[in-house]
Amino acid sequence: MIPRSYYWLLLASTLLMASAFVVSKLFIVDGIHPLVLVASRFTLAGALAIIWLSLRRQLETPKTLSDVGGVFLVGTLQTAVLFGTGFIAMEHLSAATISLLTLTMPIWVTGMLALINRKFPPLLQLIALGVGMAGVALIIGSGVSQAGMGELQWFALALVGAACWASATVFTKTSGLSITGWSLNAWQMLVGGGEVLILALAMDLPGIKLVLVSDILLFIWLVVPASILSFGFWFSALKLGGAAVTSGYLFLIPLFTALISVPVLNASFAPMQLLGGVAVGAAVWLMSRSPT
């Protein structure tokens, strides 16, 4: 029997992850460059997580060149590319839309594993793939009809990020890395954040200027609760409920993002966007119920 704490961990982690999209959008609207925000957030979050794990003597370190390469690959795909593309797209799209497109990751994973294993997915997964693709089409179609074809590139950019996250997930599932959980997340955040930091410095982008107390508090929230704690709670939930069941609740992230966006960002959504969001959420839920 799954303990009640599992659902509290699940609720806390998805709510914190959702808040990260909204807070990031606030900073981007205020003029902070998306790449600078990614670099600052994840370099600091990764460093703090590594220090915290070291103090608790729970930090796992890469032991072979294969592990080092694996950590760099995951960090590049799951932090640098995922959030780099997502935050750039967020300059033009709503936080809820980016959240929805990012959370198509389980759908991409299913397709990739089917190609790698050369095995036809189970019927329920095929249904989920179809529903998910229809949902993405509705979200993109509604957005393009409102803003024009010029916005299509930003939807595509967010989907590229989701596909890269899926690639990192497939790699961690199949590579047998010796580093897992909290430690892998800490290292990959530091690596990905560091890569984007180097890029931001090379582009001579202006740094973050946090003048108001509210800005400082929001940035602390973005780094600690919305980055370090959210993933920590998520890993704890995975241990209690298993990956299959837990991944079915990923749809809560775009749902919470949309709910928070309404009062904080004065967001509004077209009926087709809402229908597409429901379809993507249903697809993720169906994926978790499908036999592997």
PLM-predicted stretches and their roles:
Residues M1-S40, A147-T174, G194-I198:
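Glycine-/small-residue-enriched transmembrane alpha-helix faces in small-molecule transporters
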Residues S13, S40, T79, F83, ...:
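Helix-helix packing/entry segments at the starts of transmembrane helices
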Residues L16, A20-F21, I50-T102, L138, ...:
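Specific transmembrane alpha-helical segments of multi-pass solute transporters/efflux pumps
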Residues A18, V22, G75-A80, G84, ...:
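Hydrophobic/small/kink-forming positions within alpha-helical transmembrane segments
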Residues F27, L37, R41, A89, ...:
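Hydrophobic/aromatic residues within transmembrane alpha-helices
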Residues L48-L53, G86, M105-G130, L255-L275:
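C-terminal transmembrane-helix exit sites in multi-pass transporters
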Residues A49, P121-G143, V196, F251, ...:
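Hydrophobic transmembrane alpha-helices of multi-pass small-molecule transport proteins
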Residues A49, V109-G111, L115, Q146-D204, ...:
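Transmembrane alpha-helical segments that form core, pore/gating elements
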